[in-house]
């Protein structure tokens, strides 16, 4: 049940019946303060202005056409034309009963599912995944899980970088190791070391650099031996990625990899189509597209280069081919790109050109979902203590160890196996949640102490809240199957919890619509806090049976909502901590 959507529909219909245009919006929002009701409609003033009416008069005209008697106790006009809605306790009770009996918490799949292509993670295979890959991977995965929960057909696309001039350097180094009878798989066990060694040879050995350039040409020409070496490198690199994905608990698998090289055969076709449409212009021997939409104040245009002077193709060409593939082969209705904010201009150009060239249908949504940078305490991009790039796998291992030490110090009586498992869950959850709980578009500072804290909007706090609710239900020694009585809402803390529980769908809808998991994180944090306030004010286990059963159902609903919400974020829960 999405209360906000329901109220928007009804109030908008009443506004139209009162004389507003069909495009008038009710703009229903959750009320910031209880004295303003549970929801507030803020669209009256805009509609009244268009009608040249007094806002309060139009608000009254809207109320005359509005019937919310089935769900609202009171509907009132406030201030210059706001409409405040106070929900009925009996209606809330009925909704909570439906939540109790629904595995999906009464969230229905969408009526018209879409094919949504989601491009996320997408590391370059020349190096191991590092902290810079964290945001795209965990944010993209949370959005994918949420879209699938709503019933959309989601196509994961891990657009890994497996092509380009740097691979000639890497292949030359692999070739040298093989000639020296070194074991390549062992050398590749640390991709960072391998890459640095190859780069050193390239910078210091002219013969090696020449051989690297030759191998780039051979690779692009389809040389079998060169392709075999390249394929071995790619396979080992992807195995590293898969190990990190497994540790991180994201849903990406080998089958979701759609590398840059997959589009190679189509790149010339892309250039030819642009040429046939008269969109290309030669500039210093390169094939470029100049679009007036991207002119600066001086009228200078930053072009999209789709083919270099020597005939080589660029990232832009590959991205254009990917757009065509996602539209015409995958039949996407919507394509989401979870890529660094620094690529914003690039994607604006790609999307605009794709539409000019007819690579996508007019109704297909192409959406860049930019994100900020993970920063260190010095205000610069996060590095290791030695100043190097932080490998993601090492970071996750450290998170698990730190969480293990923290939990072990609080629970010395637990056996080692359970402590290690709790350390794993809490450690990984802490890193993911610290990222997911921040506004996607903002930078944030990576800080072990804050992310592993049991206070505030953190994973440890939410995991503890869930385990505490679960333990309350367990200690009641009542079979939850028998908890079928009416849920009573008598105390203000019961009511606050009831309203918050009924707002779950609104939170996850924002994730699906806007690609912003922090809305769900904020909701879960508010829910946990609302439950704690309820639990302190409203005894459960010591209450009379009828009250106990009612409050246990509120607790069960809370546990179910926390568990499902965290699972949509890709975070495991623990029954005990």
Swiss-Prot record:
GO terms for MF: arginine-tRNA ligase activity; ATP binding
Compartments, record wording: Cytoplasm
Pfam families with a match to the protein in the record: Arg_tRNA_synt_N, DALR_1, tRNA-synt_1d
Main localization of the protein described in the UniProt heading: cytoplasm
Superkingdom as given in the UniProt entry: Bacteria
GO CC terms in record: cytoplasm
Motif ('HIGH' region): 123-133
EC number(s) recorded for this UniProt protein: 6.1.1.19
Known catalytic reactions: tRNA(Arg) + L-arginine + ATP = L-arginyl-tRNA(Arg) + AMP + diphosphate
Key words, A-Z: Aminoacyl-tRNA synthetase, ATP-binding, Cytoplasm, Ligase, Nucleotide-binding, Protein biosynthesis
Cross-referenced InterPro entries: aa-tRNA-synth_I_CS (IPR001412), Arg-tRNA-ligase (IPR001278), Arg-tRNA-synth_N (IPR005148), Arg-tRNA-synth_N_sf (IPR036695), ArgRS_core (IPR035684), DALR_anticod-bd (IPR008909), Rossmann-like_a/b/a_fold (IPR014729), tRNAsynth_Ia_anticodon-bd (IPR009080)
Biological processes per GO annotation: arginyl-tRNA aminoacylation
Family indicated by similarity: Belongs to the class-I aminoacyl-tRNA synthetase family.
Assembly, per entry: Monomer.
Name of the protein in its database record: Arginine--tRNA ligase
Species per Swiss-Prot/TrEMBL record: Marinomonas sp. (strain MWYL1)
Gene transcribed to yield this protein: argS
């Amino acid at each position: 049940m999405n209360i906000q959507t329901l109220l928007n529909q009804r109030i908008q219909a009443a506004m139209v019946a009162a004389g507003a245009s069909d495009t008038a919006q009710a703009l229903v929002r959750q009320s910031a303060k209880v004295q303003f009701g549970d929801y507030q409609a803020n669209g009256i003033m805009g509609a009244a202005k268009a009608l040249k009416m007094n806002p309060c008069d139009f608000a009254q005209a809207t109320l005359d056409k509005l019937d919310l008697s089935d769900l609202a106790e009171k509907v009132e006009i406030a201030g210059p034309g706001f409409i405040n809605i106070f929900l009925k306790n009996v209606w809330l009770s009925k909704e909570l009963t439906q939540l109790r009996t629904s595995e999906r918490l009464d969230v229905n799949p969408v009526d018209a599912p879409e094919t949504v292509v989601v491009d996320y993670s997408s590391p370059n295979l020349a190096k191991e995944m590092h902290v810079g890959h964290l945001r795209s991977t965990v944010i993209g995965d949370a959005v994918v899980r949420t879209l699938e929960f709503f019933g959309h057909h989601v196509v994961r696309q891990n657009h890994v970088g497996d092509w380009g001039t740097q691979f000639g350097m890497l292949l030359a180094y692999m070739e040298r190791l093989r000639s020296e009878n070194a074991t390549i798989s062992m050398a590749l066990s640390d991709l960072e070391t391998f890459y640095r060694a190859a780069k050193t040879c390239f910078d210091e050995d002219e013969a090696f650099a020449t051989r690297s350039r030759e191998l780039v040409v051979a690779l692009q020409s389809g040389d079998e031996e060169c392709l075999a070496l390249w394929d071995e490198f790619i396979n080992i690199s992807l195995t590293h990625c898969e190990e990190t994905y497994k540790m991180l608990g994201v849903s990406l698998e080998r089958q979701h990899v759609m590398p840059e090289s997959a589009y190679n055969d189509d790149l010339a076709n892309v250039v030819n189509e642009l040429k046939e449409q008269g969109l290309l212009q030669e500039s210093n021997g390169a094939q470029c597209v100049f679009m007036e939409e991207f002119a600066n104040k001086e009228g200078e245009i930053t072009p999209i280069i789709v083919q270099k002077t020597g005939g080589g193709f660029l990232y832009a060409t590959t991205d254009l081919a990917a757009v065509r593939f996602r539209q015409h082969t995958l039949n996407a209705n919507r394509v989401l790109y979870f890529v660094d904010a620094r690529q914003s201009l690039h994607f604006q150009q790609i999307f605009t050109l794709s539409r000019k060239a007819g690579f996508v249908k007019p109704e297909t949504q192409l959406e860049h979902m930019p994100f900020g940078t993970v920063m260190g305490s010095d205000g610069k991009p996060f590095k290791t203590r030695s100043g190097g790039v932080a490998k993601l796998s090492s970071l996750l291992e450290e998170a698990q160890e730190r969480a293990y030490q923290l939990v072990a110090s609080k629970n010395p009586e637990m056996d080692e196996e359970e402590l290690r498992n709790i350390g794993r869950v809490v450690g990984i959850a802490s890193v993911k949640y610290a990222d997911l709980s921040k506004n996607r578009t903002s930078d944030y500072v990576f800080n072990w102490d804050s992310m592993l804290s049991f206070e505030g909007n953190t994973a440890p706090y939410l995991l503890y809240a869930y385990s505490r609710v679960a333990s309350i239900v367990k200690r009641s020694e009542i079979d939850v199957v028998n908890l079928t009585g009416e849920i009573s809402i008598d105390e203000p803390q019961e009511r606050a919890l009831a309203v918050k529980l009924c707002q779950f769908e609104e939170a996850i809808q924002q994730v699906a619509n806007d690609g912003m998991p922090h809305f769900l994180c904020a909701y879960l944090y508010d829910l946990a806090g609302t439950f704690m306030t309820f639990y302190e004010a409203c005894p459960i286990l010591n209450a009379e049976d009828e009250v106990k059963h009612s409050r246990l159902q509120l607790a069960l609903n809370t546990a179910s909502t926390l568990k499902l919400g965290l699972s949509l974020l890709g975070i495991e829960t623990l029954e005990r901590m």
